[in-house]
């Protein structure tokens, strides 16, 4: 039921949102060792990215989509749903472009929304990603049942892939803008 009824959990601080706060504090501490601050920076960047990938903020008794086997409508290769959202569609979006070119495209497209995206906290941002997972990533799957991972390989329709390719770039842009904001305010 975690997917259908979002219940934020953070058992003993073992969650990304708590760790983001922790790593931000270490990074801001000028008395912390260089090694500790460098590790905090690496992990902060990783965790901030993770909370913007919807399947990192949700679970349908399927290990965040890792147990859901899917195929794209264009092929026969089998992937996990998590892999499709984390890697396959992102690579398709970027294509043969250089990463900095794609990043500049995201900036140009989404810049008018940047200030609005800075409202809230990592907990709220993770909750927003969870809603996206609930309403789009999972609920739009063929044969979706809340709380039950599919037993068969699902084919992701052209429509499903098209819609995913509309929200994934925005999630990447949000992650980048929020990361820049946190780093700039922490390291000023």
PLM feature spans:
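N-terminal, motif-rich segments that launch catalysis or mediate targeting to/interaction with membranes
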Residues: 1-47, 54-188
